[in-house]
């Protein structure tokens, strides 16, 4: 669900968020900063957003499970990716948190090779993390790549012609083409070593082997692990999931809620400066439930103030919490199902998408519903924090809120405007002034709209959206559902009963595994995360030029998609207004890519 510099050198642009964080301070408050001796031990309890719960443990995520609860709040706690992006108050490659040294990149004969040396990490069973563990993950990925959330045809792993083990700590990947070194990290950052010496099995009772070295064997191993992954009730007891190289091990899990408890991995080889010994991650059904718990029990160490309750921050700080916004590097959107038989032909008309975008009052929503804790989305590259990846054109809003412009667009293309009802196509056809290809006479602008419940700000956005659309004669039938349900539904679907508009209310973060904001998994016609089946040959062509085209190619790509509207752009909410126990240290500054670092947290007396 997340993101992706350009230069021939291996220097990665790390964007400081100083201006961003300074801007957030004006909207934040905090309790007096507690100081005192460090406490050894203790438990930190984290509150997740409503409906976001841990329900996928295998580090080969499917798109519908690519959520914060399954990545930053579980997978990354237990298994570390090869390269880590983000850090306290910054984006970009984090060499300290990465489990491999920067890649040595060479080009020969039109092909790029990355040679990688692993740092001396160990699994929790004492065995070293080796090149074979990386190869194991890679082989399993190839065995079931179509289900992997990061898959785009022709990109990783299709573009790897050779994986060579040089030594237990060194390996190389040769790619079929020439890549910019920094873009290459988009590919390399997706690699996650997993314990071949413990997981390379075809059944629970079978021996560990080297089955993954053949395609047929890799499929069997993947099938076995996928079956184990589906058994949520055994997440905390299955010996497979106890072999980790991350800083935390799962000790307790409630399958019905996704609540999880972790303890420190004593064998963790990476940086860890904190002192807490355990971590609890809790799911909530609504903002109200979380906020009531935060105020009443004091049992939450790291929670949030709902946007709708932003004015109540004083109550939280008086209870000893420090409060600060958590801006994130991402984009937010409403997805359109271009393949829906009833309405796909309508969504394929650019003027319809332009009219809809003109009816979305992003500035108004940020002010009224997010209370200033958000930023607009104008295209496929985040506006905040400012970075060299953002073109000067995409800093401007190509479709500002303008209901009259929306009505004019629809009327000019053959629609009878019915304010408060549903506009009707009265001029079918394919000329510039007709409704467009595939739209019949009498067809109406009436759509089902699925959205995630539980977050009051999202509910208010959707209600305002429905009202604005209605005034222009676009009828929305709202269908609220839990966050996990809405995310799971946002996949390709071509039946008449399928979803039409889908809004899960949270942003697409350019993390994990990305160094610059290449959205190919979302916008390429073969991208596995292209749930709406958007298909634009020009977009595909521009995306194909990103690996070797540098920043000019990235700018051309984003400027095109900003105006083409493969999705409807919505405000990017801050991750949350964080509320942290005043005695819990090491949390701030927060990571714009949504990662957490509880191994560095500690309490003071």
Residue ranges of predicted features:
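Ligand-site clamp/hinge motif
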Residues: 117-118, 122, 236-239, 259-314, ...
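A bilobed periplasmic-binding-protein/Venus flytrap-type ligand-binding module shared by bacterial periplasmic
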Residues: 263-267, 328-352, 368, 394, ...
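Surface-exposed binding/hinge segments that line
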Residues: 153-226
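Aromatic- and charge-enriched surface segment that lines or borders ligand/interaction sites
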Residues: 101-149, 161, 166, 171-174, ...
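Tryptophan-rich aromatic "cage" segments
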Residues: 60-62, 580-605
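Append "and occasionally in soluble cytosolic enzymes with long acidic Gly/Pro-rich linkers
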Residues: 261-263, 348-467, 556
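Extracytoplasmic/peripheral linker and loop segments enriched in polar/acidic and small residues
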Residues: 37, 354, 366, 408, ...
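N-terminal lobe/hinge region of extracytoplasmic solute-binding protein
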Residues: 45-109, 139, 243
């Amino acid at each position: 669900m997340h993101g992706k510099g350009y230069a021939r050198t291996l220097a990665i642009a790390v964007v400081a968020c100083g201006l961003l964080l300074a801007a957030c301070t004006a909207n934040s408050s905090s309790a007096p900063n507690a100081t005192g001796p460090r406490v050894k031990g203790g438990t930190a309890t984290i509150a997740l957003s409503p409906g976001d719960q841990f329900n996928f443990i295998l580090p080969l995520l499917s798109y519908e499970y690519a959520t914060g609860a399954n990545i930053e709040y579980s997978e990354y706690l237990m298994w570390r990716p090869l390269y880590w992006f983000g850090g306290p108050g910054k984006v970009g490659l984090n060499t300290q948190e990465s489990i491999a040294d920067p890649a040595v990149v060479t080009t020969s004969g039109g092909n790029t090779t990355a040679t990688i040396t692993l740092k001396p990490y160990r699994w929790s069973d004492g065995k070293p993390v080796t090149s074979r563990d990386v190869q194991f993950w890679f082989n399993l990925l190839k065995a079931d790549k179509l289900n992997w959330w990061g898959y785009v045809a022709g990109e990783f792993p299709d573009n790897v012609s050779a994986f060579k083990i040089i030594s237990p700590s060194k390996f190389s990947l040769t790619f079929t083409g020439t890549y910019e070194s920094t873009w290459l990290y988009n590919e390399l950052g997706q690699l996650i070593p997993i314990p071949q010496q413990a997981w390379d099995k075809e059944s629970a009772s079978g021996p560990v082997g080297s089955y993954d070295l053949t395609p047929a064997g890799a499929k069997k191993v993947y099938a076995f692990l996928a079956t184990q992954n589906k058994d949520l009730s055994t997440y905390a007891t299955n010996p497979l999931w106890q072999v980790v190289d991350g800083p935390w091990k799962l000790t307790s899990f409630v399958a019905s809620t996704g609540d999880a408890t972790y303890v420190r991995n004593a064998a963790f080889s990476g940086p860890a400066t904190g002192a807490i010994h355990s971590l609890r991650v809790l799911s909530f059904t609504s903002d109200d439930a979380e906020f009531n718990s935060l105020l009443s029990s004091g049992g939450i160490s790291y929670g949030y103030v709902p946007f709708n309750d932003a004015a109540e921050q004083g109550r939280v700080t008086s209870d000893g919490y420090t409060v600060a916004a958590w801006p994130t590097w991402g984009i937010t959107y409403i997805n359109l199902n271009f393949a829906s038989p009833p309405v796909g032909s309508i969504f394929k008309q650019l003027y319809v998408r332009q009219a809809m975008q003109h009816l979305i009052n992003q500035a108004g929503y940020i002010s009224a519903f997010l209370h200033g804790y958000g930023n607009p989305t104008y295209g496929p590259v985040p506006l905040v924090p400012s970075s060299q990846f953002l073109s000067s054109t995409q800093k401007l809003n190509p479709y500002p809120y303008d209901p009259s412009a929306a009505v004019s667009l629809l009327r000019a293309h053959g629609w009878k405007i019915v304010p408060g009802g549903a506009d009707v196509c009265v001029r079918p056809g394919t000329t510039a002034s007709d409704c467009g290809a595939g739209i019949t006479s009498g067809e109406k602008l009436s759509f089902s709209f699925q959205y995630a419940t539980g977050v009051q700000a999202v509910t208010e956005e959707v209600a305002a959206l429905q009202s604005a659309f209605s005034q222009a004669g676009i009828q929305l039938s709202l269908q609220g559902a839990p966050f996990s349900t809405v995310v799971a539904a946002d996949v390709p679907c071509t039946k008449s009963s399928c979803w039409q508009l889908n809004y899960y209310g949270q942003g697409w973060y350019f993390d994990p595994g990305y160094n610059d904001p290449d959205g190919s998994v979302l916008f390429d016609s073969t991208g596995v995360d292209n749930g709406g089946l958007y298909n634009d040959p020009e977009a595909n062509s521009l995306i194909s030029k990103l690996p070797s085209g540098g920043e000019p190619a990235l700018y051309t790509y984003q400027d095109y998609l900003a105006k083409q509207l493969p999705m409807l752009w919505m405000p990017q909410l801050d991750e949350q207004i964080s509320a942290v126990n005043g005695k819990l240290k090491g949390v701030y500054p927060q990571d714009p890519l949504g990662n957490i670092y509880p191994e560095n947290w500690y309490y003071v007396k």
